[in-house]
Structure formats: structure tokens, C-alpha cells
Amino acid sequence: MKIKNSLKALKARHRDNRLVRRKGRVYIINKQNPRFKARQG
């Protein structure tokens, strides 16, 4: 999982990326291609 300050560019890398909020953190998840997972930090 990548940890980035800004997820906007990462979200645009794949059309199946989803932006989700869990426990106060912001994540990018991708069921089709899990290598795009990222967390904002």
C-alpha cells in the first residue's frame, strides 16, 4: 500500500479506483487490481 499526501492523482490512475473513508483515514481501494491501494497520510 502506498502512503501519499494527496490521493487525487492516484485515483486517476485506474478507472475502478474508489475513494473511501475509514476510521478518519482516506483510502483508495481497487477490487480489480489491488496494487493501486493507497492511504492518505
From Swiss-Prot:
UniProt GO MF annotations: structural constituent of ribosome
Assigned keywords, A-Z: Ribonucleoprotein, Ribosomal protein
Any GO CC annotation of this UniProt entry: ribonucleoprotein complex
UniProt-listed GO biological process terms: translation
Keyword Transmembrane: no
Domain of life per record: Bacteria
This protein's record includes keyword Ribosomal protein: yes
Coiled-coil annotated spans: none
A Pfam family hit: Ribosomal_L36
Alphabetized InterPro entries for the sequence: Ribosomal_bL36 (IPR000473), Ribosomal_bL36_sp (IPR035977), Ribosomal_L36_bact (IPR047621)
Family of the protein in this entry: Belongs to the bacterial ribosomal protein bL36 family.
Entry-linked HAMAP family: Ribosomal_bL36
PANTHER family, per the entry: 50S RIBOSOMAL PROTEIN L36 2, LARGE RIBOSOMAL SUBUNIT PROTEIN BL36B
Annotated NCBIfam families: PRK00831.1, rpmJ_bact
Protein name per Swiss-Prot or TrEMBL: Large ribosomal subunit protein bL36
Organism: Allorhizobium ampelinum (strain ATCC BAA-846 / DSM 112012 / S4)
